[in-house]
Amino acid sequence: MSLTTGVYGAAGHSSVDVKDDDGSRAGTVRDDAGSLGGYLNLIHNSSGLWADIVAQGTRHSMKASSDNNDFRVRDWGWLGSLETGLPFSITDNLMLEPQLQYTWQGLSLDDGQDNAGYVRFGHGSAQHVRAGFRLGSHNDMTFGEGTSSRAPLRDSAKHSVRELPVNWWVQPSVIRTFSSRGDMRVGTSTAGSGMTFSPSQNGTSLDLQAGLEARVRENITLGVQAGYVHSVSGSSAEGYNGQATLNVTF
């Protein structure tokens, strides 16, 4: 049994365009976030069975903008995840890995207001179970000796992109969201104008992710990932996503 622990940090930015019922532009919502987390990885050496445990906290700074009106809030988010998988070799360079993951996440937003009125947020949380598999290449990612024709890079870089160690993968999954909770109350200064909304994320989604990683130096790996989530029942999430990663070891 091998065990690996570590900490990580991340920064993110998202921007969403909001449209009115008639399709016209209503405004934008932006979110800048910084995260700090820790992880524990366990691997059974003889079978390859692995488990990942992750705990993460995130600080959000959100801004909703429309014509002549802004709304800003800050909040804290948290996430806990337990994921496991068992890889099977189909060929020497192709692997199939069934996976199962449980995730619990929550969000606590500050109250806010704009020119139209106030918004009071409660504490929200949701649980997710993902079942799927990962199919991809299983090539040796050892960088080896440099082959660059440029003298300064001769020992640390490859002559061409085709010489880089590369792995690809695709990951289809089914995601079930349940026990989602969270209230939001909006109103104005007028007495009795307040209304409470209790949106739900409960439902089932189909998720497809694909990625590629390449070792460009002995200690540097670059990766890209893209995916699409489609809701098939309830009020579960739907949309596109993308991610680029840079991994440097010391």
Map each language-model feature to its residues:
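Membrane translocator/pore-forming domains, dominated by Gram-negative outer-membrane beta-barrels
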Residues: 1-250
